[in-house]
């Protein structure tokens, strides 16, 4: 697991996998500094309730985990992430899955322990 301090300092540039579990209430924009290499993003165990509309800037993102957060619906922005094939939003309060939130290359969708 990495820290927000490492992310902000630029120490993580070039990594392919990022796991941040540090009570985040908003998406750290510094993640975009990893846009050319990041393939796996794990933001589980935070307090997030939304993702930014420009998440698709993470061009190589294949896997995203946002379990144990505060989402009430699957974010529509996921549907605009061209390479995304695995989405995990376990243990949130998700009640709605808009069709637009499902990426074209989606193979695995994990939504257990939601409402």
Regions found by a protein language model. Give the residues of each.
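N-terminal "cap/leader" segments of large eukaryotic alpha-helical scaffolds
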Residues: 1-4
């Amino acid at each position: 697991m990495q820290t927000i301090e490492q992310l902000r300092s630029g120490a993580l540039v070039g990594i392919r996998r990022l796991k941040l579990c540090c009570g985040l209430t908003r998406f750290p924009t510094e993640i975009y500094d990893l846009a050319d290499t990041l393939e796996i993003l794990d933001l589980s165990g935070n307090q997030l309730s939304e993702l930014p509309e420009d998440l698709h800037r993470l061009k190589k993102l294949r896997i995203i985990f946002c379990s144990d957060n505060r989402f009430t619906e699957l974010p529509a922005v996921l549907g605009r992430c061209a390479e995304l094939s695995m989405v995990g939003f376990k243990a949130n309060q998700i009640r709605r899955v808009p069709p637009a939130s499902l990426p074209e290359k989606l193979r695995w969708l994990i939504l257990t322990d939601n409402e």
